[in-house]
Regions:
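N-terminal leader/pro-regions and domain N-caps
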Residues: 19-65
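C-terminal motif of bacterial Sec signal peptides marking the signal peptidase cleavage site
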Residues: 14-17
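A short beta-strand-loop element at or near the start of a globular domain
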Residues: 45-103
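Proprotein-processing/basic-patch segments
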Residues: 22-32, 163-212
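Beta-strand-rich interaction/scaffold domains
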Residues: 104-167
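Extracellular/periplasmic catalytic domains that process cell-envelope and extracellular macromolecules
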Residues: 69-70, 91, 147-149, 166-170, ...
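Sec-dependent signal peptide recognition
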Residues: 2-9
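Beta-strand elements of well-folded, non-transmembrane domains
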Residues: 80-82, 99-103, 119-121, 160, ...
Length: 212
């Protein structure tokens, strides 16, 4: 769940453990994705051509359209540097990705999803970023989308991905979200990526990291 804090883009809270006087403080930082670099890439099922949609798109798609069979992969970019970011020498206690689901198709069944940690600079999307061979994943996790997630926040544990990003010393936490391919029924989700200032603290993708 997101918190109605005006300065949500760079909000940090220091939590000091009460277990002992010499304990290391844990800092929690909340970082909204950068809509300038967020976007999605669609692969046309018939023609095999890519369509890149980026820069303040308001929403991004991930999954396979059950009607057209076009496949979409969403990309989210969270800057880790600067005030409110995550220092390169920090240890990661935990990390979560919070996304708001605007729509789910088809309106039945569960959609298996995959999140890849990726890295490309500058963070401008091009068609080949769709390809997991040409743009390989540094680490991956899977999670399900249920019909009950429609119109709600979905919070995914991305601790392993954030630790890998730290290990590589990445300046951004960049993820590719797609349907976990296999013998599954096609399904697609629409993720809110609003640029409306009043709405971003409530609906924009949010990375929350606890570090020490």
């Amino acid at each position: 769940m997101k918190f109605p804090i005006a300065v949500m883009l760079i909000a940090s809270l220091t939590l000091v453990s009460c277990s002992g006087g010499g304990s290391t403080p844990t800092i929690v930082t909340r970082i909204l994705s950068d809509p300038v670099y967020d976007g999605d890439i669609g692969l046309d099922f018939v023609s095999g051509t890519f369509t890149v949609t980026k820069n303040n798109t308001q929403f991004v798609f991930a999954g396979i359209d059950p009607v057209t069979l076009d496949e979409y992969r969403a990309f989210l970019d969270f800057p880790l540097g600067g005030p409110g970011g995550v220092p390169l020498n920090a240890g990661i206690a935990s990390a979560t990705l919070d996304i708001f689901i605007n729509d789910i198709q088809p309106p039945i069944g569960t959609i298996p999803m995959r999140i890849d940690l990726v890295y490309f600079q500058p963070p401008n999307l091009i068609g080949t970023d769709f390809d997991r061979t040409l743009q390989p994943a540094l680490a991956s996790i899977t999670f399900p989308i249920f019909q009950s997630d429609f119109g709600r926040h979905v919070v995914v544990n991305v601790t392993s991905l954030m630790r890998e990003a730290q290990r590589w010393g990445l300046p951004d936490f960049q993820v590719r979200i797609m349907e976990d391919l296999g013998p599954v029924v096609p399904g697609i989700i629409e993720i809110d990526d609003t640029t409306i200032a009043a709405d971003r603290p409530f609906f924009a993708p949010l990375l929350e990291v606890a570090y020490y």
